[in-house]
A protein has these predicted regions:
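Active-site-proximal loop->helix
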Residues: 44-89, 162-163, 182-194
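Active-site-adjacent helical/loop segments in soluble small-molecule enzymes
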Residues: 202-251
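A short, small-residue-rich loop immediately preceding and capping a beta-strand
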Residues: 29-49, 53-62, 145-153
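Small/polar-residue-rich loop-to-helix segments that shape phosphate-bearing ligand pockets
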Residues: 64-142, 200-219
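Short glycine/serine/threonine-rich phosphate/pyrophosphate-binding segments
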Residues: 19, 39-45, 152-160, 238-241
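Positively charged, low-complexity intrinsically disordered leader regions
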Residues: 1-31
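Glycine-rich phosphate/pyrophosphate-binding loop at beta-loop-alpha junctions
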Residues: 128-208, 261-267
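Phosphate-binding loop/pocket of nucleotide- and phosphate-handling active sites
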Residues: 248-267
């Protein structure tokens, strides 16, 4: 296991890799407008970074039925001084379709004037570059036959694919934490095909979608942590664990632990 979860207790794993370039280059005087779901790892990580740099953050959360007290993820963001707005799923989809650019009405409603957009999951050029560093850290040491990781927006997988050489002997296994993530699957599949890299995309069909778990998965997660003393989160890495426990892979297998917030799950 490559333990990127140890990078930072809050800006954990792939989150630091996605965010560091943005915060190096952004205008610290402008509000950051960013987006995520109720159990987004991105929002707490961005909250920590925004507070650290003394910046104002406005977070648009998918799910109009939610509030700042709905779960520890959202409560943490509010406690860091972030301004949270909750929108319907249809409004959120429309924002995604507009590349996260708000309408004039939305800007007025959320009271954002001078702002810069940080896309959902931290996706973008900075994130691709940051996540590409993962490959250079893994390959010289382990030369894996299989590299297995979780995906939400697939930003980490895309960054790794960009960094991998064409015709690589390493097979990439991407375990989606999201049900029916067809756009993300298509982006990863097309990039892998263009570089002649073997990619397996595992859709989230076993548990009902993002944030959904059952007792079998939770038991596997608990048992793994008891045996290894390695905490893993339920939304992403527990589903990688489930995949690895049900598939037989020959050769060196590296599990990329992309971090998460198992601490929040106990609150």
């Amino acid at each position: 296991m490559k333990r990127d979860d140890l990078i930072h207790p809050v800006v954990s794993g792939n989150k630091w890799r996605k965010l560091k370039g943005f915060f190096q280059d952004c205008d610290k005087s402008k509000t950051v407008l960013t987006f995520g779901g109720a159990y987004s790892n991105h929002l707490p990580a961005a909250s920590f970074a925004l507070k650290y740099f003394g910046m104002h953050g406005v977070m648009i959360v998918r799910g109009e039925e939610l509030n700042e007290r709905s779960n520890p993820y959202l409560s943490y963001c509010a406690a860091q001084g972030m301004q949270l707005h909750f929108v319907s799923r249809s409004e959120y989809r429309a924002l995604r379709a507009r590349q996260w650019q708000p309408t004039q009405e939305q800007s007025q409603r959320w009271n954002v004037k001078e702002f810069q957009v940080l896309p959902e999951g931290g996706a973008g050029v900075h994130a691709n570059q940051g996540c590409g560093e993962i490959w250079s850290e893994i390959y010289p040491i382990l030369t894996p036959k299989h590299l297995v990781l979780a995906a939400g927006t697939a930003t980490t997988a895309l960054g790794i694919l960009h960094a991998m050489p064409a015709n690589s002997d390493t097979q990439l296994h991407v375990v989606s934490a999201v049900k029916g993530a067809k756009k993300e699957q298509e982006l990863a599949t097309d990039l892998a095909y263009s570089k002649n890299i073997t990619l397996s995309w595992i859709d989230e069909t076993s548990f009902g979608g993002f944030g959904r778990v059952n007792d079998v998965l939770l038991d596997k997660k608990t048992s793994f942590t008891e045996k290894t003393a390695i905490p893993i989160d339920r939304n992403y890495n527990a589903k990688v664990l489930n995949y690895l426990s049900n598939v037989r892979l020959n050769g060196t297998v590296v599990w990329l632990n992309t971090g998460g917030y198992p601490l929040f799950e106990r609150l």
